Swiss-Prot record:
Organism: Homo sapiens
Sequence ranges of Acidic residues compositional bias: 81-94, 131-142
UniProt-recorded name of the protein: Amyloid-beta A4 precursor protein-binding family A member 2
Top-level taxon of origin: Eukaryota
GN (gene name): APBA2
Residues with PTM Phosphoserine: S11, S208
Length: 749
């Protein structure tokens, strides 16, 4: 087996091949679906090369100060929005089964969201979220983190961030800000799994690359209003650097035409050891005449594209509607589809070239597409929670590799038993990466084996010379085979989802991960340009300066550090008697995440003592700390007190209503949290809202001295979006609010 050794940027290990444009959806083959067993799928005759040991993990880095040093074991995370739970059936092979992929953008490494019917992102401009249940969503942030590997940030001297970031897609999701953490996380938006092993579609069709395939069931979901996304971004221009916000929609991003040029990354040169791969064409999307035997494929050189033409693509794509069966998305796009001479086009063309996006490739080359040589080792499926931690993500990647390795060994033993010889040949593939999609093509035939829109990638990790690519299937509106609840009524976080995992071997595993992260950043820039937004306006420094001048957690630090508020109580109770309390979560974003006393049973031990009040936060019970524990665990500890006669509590006396103070100097600064029906659903880490004391799961009771308990949802959003200066709010846990207002019957423990 000939290993294809490619030159990297520094070491000459990267085979950098370019294609003029990704294969259009309309040219993708239709194939039947194939359900992969949970144990995994490995093509016969494959053998996994030994994994190289992992390099030491990089130190945790802040999102704006990243070292360029990478880690040989990095990972990329994308949790997409659970709000976007419309159906999108994706065909696979052989069994005629349709699977679905579901949105889930809030990763525990960045956002903590509660179960809401929908989200409302606070901004001065409304932004709809395509969901069946939520009301109009108003978004309040764009991101400061980009999808880049190995802990580097995409901003000037910064390299790839380890954060996660959803990207706008064919149904543009809310643009959410994501923080960076360790292990080189990077993130996309909507996850999906498309056309596993299409039988034809080698990418060499001459049809328009603007034609996109759509299922009939998606028509309603495609009718989003991009106008509102763009308006929101324009009003939040100071939030993030474009180089660190890698959100993009393959449908809204640039789609190079067949006549566009092929430009290779200058620092990357193709250098392969003699093998059959040297005979492969550099361009995957050849014109029809280039496919005839007599035509020289390598000599084909498309028309050179000027910078102005490059900048015009994304806007033309949005204006022309991409031949999709959706209505015109913006009021200024209702003219003829060939009329691109509108003010925004001129504005886009006036923008400078790409803002610096650190990575191994030139931005223009990622638009055209680049190719890495790799060996396809196999695929498997894993069950995963909605928002697993970073460590669990990496463990899942390692588990996928282990399963594929076991399957390869089994295939090898079976082949020997059948006296077929022990010659093992790995499937050599070309891994095509662009701002539109990631494709896996057979190295010899150039037939498409797998095709994923860039937005569908939920996670990617490189472990030594192994690359693991993951995508999670969307949930249908009704019960789905892809979601298995462990117990009836289980919380969302307890549900299990099927993750499809593809495993590849390549000496450029790290570069592959970096290139995918860079592709997200470039795609996001193209999305902004397409909608008349100058990426250079998204400055992070000014927002960071505002953050650094604000106190953390409002008055919480003072309150919790005051010894008069910290009490140690001794409660007497009868054996077999319950404590008689209801506890709720303090809410993500609180200085000490623990449980809050929400109600007490009349005549119960807690009420009889006269020492407890609603709103008190319980730090420990009988020496067992409750800080940071899940609500169910805390409830279990309290239930375990039933047979005891004395209970020792450590509490912090707190009022039931939390006071929030958000300092917003200007409307251009995002608030950094989302609400639905007055309930805070998610919170941006490190934003002015977190600094001010906003907590996930809290119900907003009052804004600037005015009660909003009976106020319509839209008016709450409007009040917050238009507020500037000091924004005073009062909130309390939503569960406590429902108990106090009689909307729920308390279940005492």
């Amino acid at each position: 087996m000939a290993h294809r050794k490619l030159e990297s940027v520094g070491s000459g290990m990267l085979d950098h091949r370019v294609r003029p444009g990704p294969v259009p959806h309309s040219q993708e083959p239709e194939s039947e679906d194939m359900e992969l067993p949970l144990e995994g799928y490995v093509p016969e005759g494959l053998e996994l090369a030994a994994l190289r040991p992992e390099s030491p993990a990089p130190e945790e880095q802040e999102c704006h100060n990243h070292s360029p040093d990478g880690d040989s074991s990095s990972d990329y995370v994308n949790n997409t929005s659970e709000e976007e739970d419309y159906d999108e059936g994706l065909p696979e092979e052989e069994e005629g089964i349709t699977y679905y992929i579901r949105y889930c953008p809030e990763d525990d490494s960045y956002l903590e969201g509660m179960d809401c019917n929908g989200e409302e992102y606070l901004a001065h401009s409304a932004h709809p979220v395509d969901t069946d249940e939520c009301q109009e969503a108003v978004e309040e942030w764009t991101d400061s983190a980009g999808p880049h590997p190995h802990g580097h940030e995409a901003e000037g001297s910064q390299d790839y961030p380890d954060g996660q970031l959803p990207i706008p897609e064919d149904e543009p999701s809310v643009l959410e800000a994501h923080d960076q953490e360790e292990d080189g996380h990077y993130c996309a938006s909507k996850e999906g799994y498309q056309d596993y092993y299409p039988e034809e579609a080698n990418g060499n069709t001459g049809a328009s690359p603007y034609r996109l395939r759509r299922g009939d069931g998606d028509l309603e979901d495609q009718e989003e209003d991009i106008d509102q996304i763009v308006a929101e971004i324009k009003m939040s221009l100071s939030m993030t650097s474009i180089t660190s916000a890698s959100e993009a929609s393959p449908e809204h991003g640039p789609e190079p035409g067949p006549e566009d040029s092929v430009e290779a990354c200058p620092p990357i040169k193709a250098s392969c050891s003699p093998s059959r791969h040297e005979a492969r064409p550099k361009s995957l999307n050849l014109l029809p005449e280039a496919k005839h035997p007599g035509d020289p494929q390598r000599g084909f050189k498309p028309k050179t594209r000027t910078p102005e033409e490059r900048l015009k693509w994304p806007h033309e794509q949005v204006c022309n509607g991409l031949e999709q069966p959706r209505k015109q998305q913006r009021s200024d796009l209702n003219g003829p589809v060939d009329n691109n001479n509108i003010p925004e086009t001129k504005k886009v063309a006036s923008f400078p070239s790409f803002v610096a996006v650190p990575g191994p490739c030139e931005p223009e080359d990622l638009i055209d597409g680049i190719i890495f040589a790799a060996n396809y080792l196999g695929s498997t499926q894993l069950l995963s929670e909605r928002n697993p931690s970073k460590n669990i993500r990496m463990m899942q990647a390692q588990e996928a590799v282990s399963r594929v390795k076991r399957m390869q060994k089994a295939a090898k033993i079976k082949k020997k038993a059948n006296s077929e010889g022990d010659a093992q040949t790995l499937t050599e593939v070309d891994l095509f990466i662009s701002t539109q999609r990631i494709k896996v093509l057979n190295a010899d035939t150039q037939e498409t084996m797998m095709d994923h829109a860039l937005r569908t990638i939920s996670y990617i990790a490189d472990i030594g010379n192994i690359v693991v690519l993951m995508a999670r299937r969307r949930m249908p509106r009704s019960a789905s085979q892809d979601c298995i609840e462990t117990t009836p009524g289980a919380q969302e976080g307890k549900k299990q989802y099927k993750m499809i995992c593809h495993v590849f071997e390549s000496e450029d595993a790290q570069l592959i991960a970096q290139s995918i992260g860079q592709a997200f950043s470039v795609a996001y820039q193209e999305f902004l340009r397409a909608n008349g937004i100058n990426p250079e306006d998204l400055s992070q420094k000014e927002y960071s300066d505002i953050i650094n001048t604000q106190e953390m957690y409002n008055d919480d630090l003072i309150h919790f550090s005051n010894s008069e508020n910290c009490k140690e109580l001794q409660l007497e109770k009868h054996k077999g008697e319950i404590l008689g309390v209801v506890v709720v979560e303090s809410g993500w974003g609180s200085i000490l995440p623990t449980v809050i006393l929400a109600n007490m049973m009349n005549g119960g031990p807690a009420a009889r003592s006269g020492k407890l009040s609603i709103g008190d936060q319980i730090m420990s019970i009988n020496g067992t700390s409750l800080v940071g524990l899940p609500l169910a665990t805390c409830q279990g500890i309290i239930k375990g007190l039933k047979n005891q006669t004395q209970v020792k509590l450590n509490i912090v006396s707190c009022p039931p209503v939390t006071t929030v103070l958000i300092k917003r100097p200007d409307l251009k600064y995002q608030l950094g949290f989302s609400v639905q029906n007055g309930i805070i659903c998610s919170l941006m880490r490190g934003g002015i809202a977190e600094r001010g004391g906003v907590r996930v799961g809290h119900r907003i009771i009052e804004i600037n001295g005015q009660s909003v308990v009976a106020t319509a949802h839209e008016k709450i959003v409007q009040a917050l979006s238009n507020s500037v200066g000091e924004i005073h709010m009062k909130t309390m846990p939503a569960a406590m609010f429902r108990l106090l207002t009689g909307q729920e019957t308390p279940l005492y423990i």
